[in-house]
Amino acid sequence: MPRGDEQRVVDAFCAWLRQDGWTVETEITFVDILAWKDGTTLLAEAKGITSSPGLDVDTAYGQLLRRMPIEPQHGWRYALVVPEETLKAALRVPQRIRDLLGLDVYSVNQDGAVTLRP
């Protein structure tokens, strides 16, 4: 179970998804957040504010890559969810690569507002 600031990020993202009509599960053994809506499955990793934001974001990318199946799954998307303070580190992976992987980056501000980032 996520702790500290990561829990804040998970809670805000899950609330945002539910408000948009997603069915959401957390505390899954292989991913922080699993959600479904209209034939789309979303697997998300979340990170909070830490003393090593670059390392933690790199770890999250690695976790997501290891969860991706060998063959593409129709309707599957992936997400990295980070606090605004960590966004710069999350966007170091070029947009083109994230697009190829079907991976979106979301940020959560201190008020819990969620934003999809380009």
Q: Which residues make up each language-model segment?
A:
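Nuclease-adjacent, charged terminal/linker segments that flank catalytic cores
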Residues: 1, 8, 19-22, 85-90, ...
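Acidic-basic catalytic patches of nuclease active cores, encompassing PD-(D/E)XK
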Residues: 1-30, 36-38
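Conserved catalytic cores of phosphodiester-cleaving nucleases, focusing on short active-site segments
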Residues: 33-35, 39-51, 66-67
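Long, charge-dense
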Residues: 55, 61, 108-114
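Histidine-anchored nucleotide/phosphate-binding helix
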Residues: 61-70
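Nucleic-acid nuclease catalytic cores
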Residues: 69-102, 106-110
